[in-house]
Amino acid sequence: MIVPRYYEDLSVLHENTMPARAYFIPASKRMDNLVEHREESDRMQLLNGTWKFQYFNSIYDVQEPFFEKDYDTENFDEIQVPSVWQMAGYDTHQYTNIRYPFPFDPPYVPQDIPCGTYAYTFVYHKDENAPKAFLNFEGVDSCFYVWINGSYV
């Protein structure tokens, strides 16, 4: 395993995140404030699309530094983002109305909980009139780690 075990540390709720705030999308001009129109903002860049993906039966199976800047992802599978890997044929759905899908023993996480690694290449276009940029993930299901150009953020 190549990542810190934050997923078993109850003292770590977030790391390297911005303080909580009201949800809004910045824009250089006045626009409709409905969330359905957020893509119309010239200061929002969606990272939706086809990402490189690897599925593992356990986080302990992740041994390669897939997050390095020049890591070869040619043999990775591809998956649509946003999506749920269970809908793409990886693993099984975890919801159930019968019993909890894995043992409950906080803060410990079973070693056989599946995980996925994602890689995506994009170009960020800096806007001099909006000097701060934020990376926002909406819908990540559990603990996750982010690297940009090989650097942990």
Model-derived segments and their meaning:
Residues 37-40, 62:
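Short secondary-structure capping/turn segments at boundaries of alpha-helices and beta-strands
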Residues 39, 43, 67-68, 114:
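Generic detector of ordered secondary-structure context
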Residues 43-54:
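Mature N-terminal segment immediately following signal peptide/propeptide cleavage
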